[in-house]
Amino acid sequence: MLIQAKAITASAAITANACYVLSVSRGAGGCEEATAYHGAAATAGNQVLSCAMEDSAGGGDYCPLPGIYCSDGLYFKIDKGTGIVRYYLAE
């Protein structure tokens, strides 16, 4: 099951029980880093977790997010072509 990540903007309404990605950046060593936030806590002062992903030829690795509050078995993957972050629920 694919869940398109929602980007937070200054005017965006924060919805309870929803997952958001606030920032995606290229970290040291060429790794992609995504910082995920949850619902009403989705502010810069309430970071849920940050996870670096290896820059692989396969278009990015899946990264488990054990600390995210939205759902058990939630993963995200970064699309190397567009930089879009997508959520996947583990089967």
For the regions a protein language model found, what residue spans apply to each?
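Surface-exposed, low-hydrophobicity beta-strand/loop segments enriched in small/polar/acidic residues
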Residues: 1-91
